[in-house]
Amino acid sequence: LPLRCPDYSCVSRRARSVNIPFKTPTRGEIAHLVIDSTGLKVCGEGEWKVKKHGQEKRRVWRKLHLAVDAGTHEVICADLSLNNVTDAEAFPGLIRQTHRKIRAACAEGAYDTKRCHDELRRKKIKALIPPRTRAGYWPAEYADRNQAVV
């Protein structure tokens, strides 16, 4: 079945005249801010070289830390760090980047540190972070977190 397909230059010319807003301006309060990170491979061997000669020991990775509005799926802020920076170390920087009011912040157990909870309390944000496995109780000022410890 022969199908015609426009080439890149034709698509590029036509795209100039399309008036679609790519970013919707959002304002106001963020109900739930979801925070997580992922690893990115910056550079490495090509597939052929790895298959032919084997893998080298050193790899170059970076970590992308993201904060996303759960309601609109908009990326509120992002931070790129070296692979040796932990999620909890990058967390305060992500929270400080946003200047909008946040009601609650969700994150995984890796963010269950006093540094993260202190930053959320400073900005009056409710923490929705599960305690780590075999977590102990913290001082009384972390009462909300202590209620989740089983």
Regions found by a protein language model. Name each.
Residues 1-56, 68-72, 121-129:
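Active-site- or DNA-interface-adjacent structural scaffold in DNA-acting proteins
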Residues 30, 63, 100-102, 124:
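A general structural motif
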Residues 44-47, 76-80, 89-93, 116-118, ...:
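A short secondary-structure junction signal
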Residues 57-63:
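Short, flexible loop/turn motifs enriched in small residues
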Residues 58, 78-100, 104:
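Active-site beta-loop-alpha junctions of metal-dependent nucleic acid enzymes
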Residues 65-83:
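A short, conserved beta-strand element enriched in hydrophobic/aromatic residues
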Residues 109-150:
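Helix-centered, glycine/charged polyanion-binding patches within enzymatic domains
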